[in-house]
Amino acid sequence: VAAAIGLKSQDLLLLDTFGAVTQPQDWEQGRRPIVWASNNFLMEQTGFSLATLRRHVRRLCEAGLIWMKDSPNGKRYGSRDEDGVIVEAYGFDLAPLAARNAEFEALYAHLQQERQFCKSMRNKITVTRRIIRAKIEKALESRLKGPWRDLQGEFALLLQRLPKRSTA
């Protein structure tokens, strides 16, 4: 899903870090998950430099996944009540991410369908390739009239042009 919406692995690392400092109740309906972690904490957790951290925050904002909720003094801070519910907070607002949950689930389902379709097509291509090779070989063994040697060579060239799939 991340690649489909233009995110890179480092964007995901930062989102994951944001998520790790939230609490389950932050994600309940009607609540706003806000992260007020310092730049130093975020840099320590991600291994980013300050410039890299700022770049990925900007990318997440541009992707519509987070908003900045600025305090009057420009600092990030927050407080929770005795139940752990955010009472007041300024920082990275993850509400856009939460609001797009259904969209991401639908996109994930669509991508899974596409992967399954591609897997099915690869399997069909493999079976068809084996059938063609077997028929050409059988024709050669049976000494049937026709350009079977030429077809065998053309088929080998065609197979060489097919993209190789990595097994990793």
Question: Which role does the model predict for each range below?
Answer:
Residues 71-79:
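Short, Lys/Arg-rich nucleic-acid/phosphate-binding segment
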Residues 133-168:
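Electrostatic interaction modules used in gene-expression and signaling proteins
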Residues 1-32, 145:
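Short recognition helix of helix-turn-helix/winged-helix DNA-binding domains
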Residues 62-71:
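A short, conserved structural fragment
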Residues 83-117:
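Short, amphipathic alpha-helical interaction segments positioned at domain boundaries
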Residues 30-47, 60:
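A short alpha-helical element within helix-turn-helix/winged-helix DNA-binding domains
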Residues 111-128, 132:
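Amphipathic alpha-helical coiled-coil segments
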